[in-house]
């Protein structure tokens, strides 16, 4: 990744693409260190950019205004119901599109994530752990992917078949992927669970959207549990985000020396508590 900063003179901006890549923090940092003697120097090209983007902006605003018209809601960061923990992270989403039961955001949440090509024991324990968590009064957060995410979502149904899970999407909430999980997503939405995304409806996920999305998974949760991860993986990235956000991280580690759990071992070696089964996790909780 890289961070692009404007040059010393705004007249050197080569194109509108550079401006649109800047985050709010980057603009704040830059403007805090530079003062322009003549504001017209930079306001003119900035307004030109806004004019050129008018149609896109109006379309996006209409999506937000009409969000509730087709069972898609929108929750602004200014809304008092916006999740408290998510609001505390460095770069919270300015708003969340959602489908399903928005009250799931009110419950204590724990994230369960892991490999898409997980071992059978990691899949089983992800489901067992999620099931015990929801019976303890919690909500399970994950990313809707195949593998550990799917097992966690499936495990987060209570005895009354209510879905107590939050699936955080990398694309719009009407572009739910992977397609093989369509039945799961429908069940989550119609049986009390929640699907959310910061992306506009009608937006397909791009590869870069998944790691950006992961900050929401960890940001919603007081703890992130890694079920199985390679040294370099989305699950490890989510764990690092959780640590940067000041949240707890724990790892499932049934045995040492299994190359499929090298990421888990690295986190354990760095100080993350580990457990060997869902039952062992809850024994640790009460010790």
Spans of model-derived segments:
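Short, small/acidic-rich helices and loops at N termini and domain boundaries
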Residues: 1-80
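Glycine-biased, small-residue-rich flexible motifs in mid-sequence functional cores and linkers
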Residues: 3-4, 72, 76-287
